[in-house]
Swiss-Prot record:
Binding annotation for Mg(2+) 2: D111, D115
This protein's UniProt keywords: Magnesium, Metal-binding, Transferase
Protein name per UniProt: Prenyltransferase terC
Known pathway: Secondary metabolite biosynthesis
Key word Kinase present: no
Domain of life of the native organism: Eukaryota
Binding residues annotated for Mg(2+) 1, in chain numbering: D111, D115
Top-level taxonomy: Eukaryota, Fungi, Dikarya, Ascomycota, Pezizomycotina
Gene assigned in the entry: terC
Cofactor note: Binds 3 Mg(2+) ions per subunit.
Source organism per UniProt: Tolypocladium album (Soil fungus)
Family: Belongs to the FPP/GGPP synthase family.
Principal EC category: transferase
Swiss-Prot/TrEMBL cofactor(s): Mg(2+)
A molecular-function term among this protein's GO annotations: metal ion binding
Amino acid sequence: MDWLGNRVSVGNIALLAIGASMGFIAKTSTLSKPEAPNTVQQYGYCKKLSSEKRNQAAGCPYEYLVSIYGRHHFESLVKEFNPLLKQEDPVKYDLVLEIMDAVHFALILVDDISDDSYQRKNQPTAHLIYGASETANRAYLVLTGVINRALRERPVLGAELLKALEDILQGQDLSLVWRRDGLKSFQYQGDESIAAYKNMASLKTGTLFVLLGRLLNDGGNELDDLLSRFGWFAQLQNDCKNIYSAEYATNKGAVAEDLRNGELSYPIVIALNDNSTSRVMERALASHAEADVEEALQALQSKPVRDACMRALQQASVGLEKLVLLWGRREKMQAGS
């Protein structure tokens, strides 16, 4: 494995990361939003802020996002699985947390650009402040930096990080192809469609959590099953909040962005398999017309689809109660009517 000693080029990581997006977004309740001028999207509006506000802003898009979420976002999980790591190996402790932050936040930065999102945790998205070009470049710079640090300090962790990035981007690539080509590229029915969606989610989201276990265990797979299941729960939870949580929509400034973008989610797959809602969903995903999307949102919020999603979410959480509590995503979802 002599390649571990070589530096990873910025260009290669940029190519890997260009399609990545990990965040979970929502649109406004009317499924519409004002269009930002192209110049604002490209260059941001930080320069237009007052000097006082500009001086208070974080120095780069990554630090801005960290200021919203908090640094060392995975610390509670690290302490749960290895409570003595900070004391026994402080260098590894810091490296693991920096790797997890870098992957999580860098992919969110790119995701918000690709989804043209305006808000995250009730704050403007980074690319609206710093511009899309600087935001994407900073994401790649952060990833490249943490990869090179890992390869220098703990080569085994660097190898795990590179493999995880490949799997995450493979999952995201599947999702983006389905979004680009529509249902002609997702020709699955019934249980097969759910399995295909879960496979994508396992790569895109499950890998992020599996990576944490691999880093803590120096490449060991002892936590793979547990953290893969938790990754599925996290994906499912965010898919459901995207449709069913008013609180989540407020924090994101929008509702049902997956639907509007033509991106598949678990509720959408369930609705596609329901005879009473399948045609409505197919029409909305094909046309993207406002009236069709509004009708599809009503179908997603219908009792059969909502109940099926809530059952799946409850089943996915079994045995993961402590991890769910530590992860701390607590936005409420509307009860069935």
